[in-house]
Curated annotation (Swiss-Prot):
The gene is mnmA. This is tRNA-specific 2-thiouridylase MnmA. Its EC number is 2.8.1.13. Pfam families: tRNA_Me_trans, tRNA_Me_trans_C, tRNA_Me_trans_M. It catalyses: S-sulfanyl-L-cysteinyl-[protein] + uridine(34) in tRNA + AH2 + ATP = 2-thiouridine(34) in tRNA + L-cysteinyl-[protein] + A + AMP + diphosphate + H(+). ATP binds at residues 9-16, 35, 124. It comes from Burkholderia lata (strain ATCC 17760 / DSM 23089 / LMG 22485 / NCIMB 9086 / R18194 / 383). One of its GO terms (cellular component) is cytoplasm. Its main location: cytoplasm. The keyword Transferase applies. GO terms for molecular function: ATP binding; tRNA binding; tRNA-uridine 2-sulfurtransferase activity. SUPFAM superfamilies: Adenine nucleotide alpha hydrolases-like (SSF52402). It is an enzyme of class 2 (transferase).
């Protein structure tokens, strides 16, 4: 009886390396696949692709599996990076990891793996897949401190049916222990913390290579000009550092935060104080919707939601929203408690306990506390 073939996405990191070893120990026919998603010539000294490939080969030799490299740089630029630039140009703050998972790691990579006669694919993500009544559910990882279901919420039934997450039941500390015990050459390698195409370079320097600067006024909610910004694309909601403002002599000395963008007038709005009403949203509207089960929750469904990675689930009620210009689905969330710095372009991801339901891209939010009159504006909505 032939072994079931599983193609493992190997990055050169500890998580994917331990994933490959675990599956090999469980008797699978494991093949490693290294994805090159960014051309070295585009990234110079900041990209670690060469060293990552060396680490993948070293690990594959140690655990006794075949490994190959595949270049998805063209697909990445077309499906992920181009959208990344479009969103920043529109004043929003995208999350390319979400799109990369949906379009590259679980689409282009999955298709390539199937061409290698694989039955399944596996990655080192911290999440879980559960089959129940013929349907597949995406669950949070056992180690909630490392849970990555937020980045995986756009996966569909076809993708989940072919996916394994061996680390979903294992604490990160145990993964490090396994790597050391079996002598992986990359056992002490640090976890990657940035987007590959940005690397360790200052983010503003990177973005400036692709987007033009367009200076404009920096104003307070009452219209007072307090400075000049270098371009709306270079700021994000809730940002404190890099604004160029100290404590206001006429104010209370509290730190300044980016609170809003007016695309039409090229104005950046800033406020003083972490809990300023302009930084607190009680409702949001999201588009570009994707549901793991293929259909949305019921109107009024009480759920939890994250509007950024590592955020605790915030209690809210799900609702339908006015469709987009082309009739595309949207949804709304009404939170029990106001949420801080809800950012257009980021993902709003819904949960029913441990189950990730799916989500969408935040388009706008209603700011201010209940009972207060919030400024009549949409947060960086430029659609």
């Amino acid at each position: 009886m032939s072994k079931r073939r599983v193609v493992v996405g190997m990055s050169g990191g500890v998580d994917s390396s331990v994933t490959a070893w675990l599956l090999k120990e469980q008797g699978y026919d494991v093949v490693g696949l290294f994805m090159k998603n960014w051309e070295d010539d585009d990234d110079g000294e900041y990209c670690s692709t060469r060293q990552d490939w060396i680490d993948v080969v070293s690990v594959a030799d140690l655990i006794g599996i075949d490994v190959e490299a595949v270049n998805f740089a063209a697909e990445y630029k077309d499906r992920v990076f181009a959208e990344f630039l479009r969103e920043y140009s529109a004043g929003r703050t995208p999350n390319p990891d979400v799109l990369c998972n949906a379009e590259i790691k679980f689409k282009a990579f999955l298709d390539h793996a199937m061409s290698l006669d694989a039955e399944m694919i596996a990655t080192g993500h911290y999440a879980r897949v559960r089959e129940r009544d013929g349907r597949f559910e995406l669950l949070k990882a056992y180690d909630h401190t490392k849970d990555q279901s937020y980045f995986l919420h756009r996966l569909n039934q076809a993708q989940l049916s072919k996916t394994m997450f061996p680390l979903g039941e294992i604490p990160k500390t145990k993964v490090r222990e396994i790597a050391a015990q079996i002598g992986l050459p990359n056992a002490k390698k640090k976890d990657s913390t940035g987007i590959c195409f940005i690397g360790e370079r200052p983010f503003r320097d990177f973005l400036n290579r692709y987007l033009p600067t367009k200076p404009g006024p920096m104003k307070t909610p009452d219209g007072k000009i307090v400075g000049e910004h270098i371009g709306l694309a270079f700021y994000t909601f809730g940002q404190r550092k890099g604004i160029g403002l100290g404590g206001s002599k006429s104010g209370n000395g509290d730190p300044w935060f980016v609170a809003a963008k007016d695309i039409a007038s090229n104005t950046l709005y800033v406020v003083q104080g972490h809990d300023h009403p302009w930084l607190l949203a009680r409702e949001l509207v999201a588009g570009n919707v994707s549901w793991v089960a293929g259909e949305p929750p019921a109107e009024g469904f009480a759920c939890g939601a994250k509007t950024r990675y590592r955020q605790a689930d915030a209690a809210c009620a799900f609702g339908a929203a006015t469709p987009g210009p082309a009739g595309e689905a949207r949804f709304s969330l009404a939170f029990d408690d106001a949420q801080w710095a809800v950012t257009p372009g980021q993902s709003a991801v819904l949960y029913d306990g441990e189950i990730c339901l799916g989500g969408g891209i935040i388009e706008s939010a209603v700011i201010g506390q209940p009972g207060q009159t919030a400024p009549a504006r949409a947060l960086a909505e430029a659609r």
